[in-house]
Amino acid sequence: MNAYDAYMKEIAQQMRGELTQNGFTSLETSEEVSEYMNQVNADDTTFVVINSTCGCAAGLARPAAVAVATQNEHRPTNTVTVFAGQDKEATATMREFIQQVPSSPSYALFKGRDLVYFMPREFIEGRDINDIAMDLKDAFDENCK
């Protein structure tokens, strides 16, 4: 592994930890994503964070995701994450399930294997964190009862 890849892996591990230390399962291979998505129950809800090393992921996407996923009255059955730019195959496989234009960071909410909500980077970057959290809260309240 070259110095750049080693550095990025170290940084990404800390950023991944912001989610995994709060109950998110990190899916790091294509196989893990496929296995997870193919075994999820039809009535389960899954909140997916497509993580990134960018500033809007650090200052907005991860904090909003953790706050709402851990504190909202209505919460998804499962919370998972893939890391764009780090776990490339896992992210590509998750994006096949999402069926939206690739975007990171971003959020997806599934009911079973059906996408019921998606927030791309353009609705995260430059917004107030409270507005992002309220959008997630509304999606959870509607779909995670």
UniProtKB/Swiss-Prot annotation:
Q: Which organism is it from?
A: Staphylococcus aureus (strain MRSA252)
Q: Which InterPro entries would you find in this protein's record?
A: BrxB/BrxA
Identify this protein by name.
Answer: Bacilliredoxin SAR1441
Task: Read off the PANTHER family from this record.
Answer: BACILLIREDOXIN BRXA, UPF0403 PROTEIN YQIW-RELATED
Q: Name one GO biological process term.
A: cell redox homeostasis
- Protein family (similarity comment): Belongs to the bacilliredoxin family.
The record's listing under Pfam families reads: Disulph_isomer
NCBIfam families given in the database record: YphP_YqiW (TIGR04191)
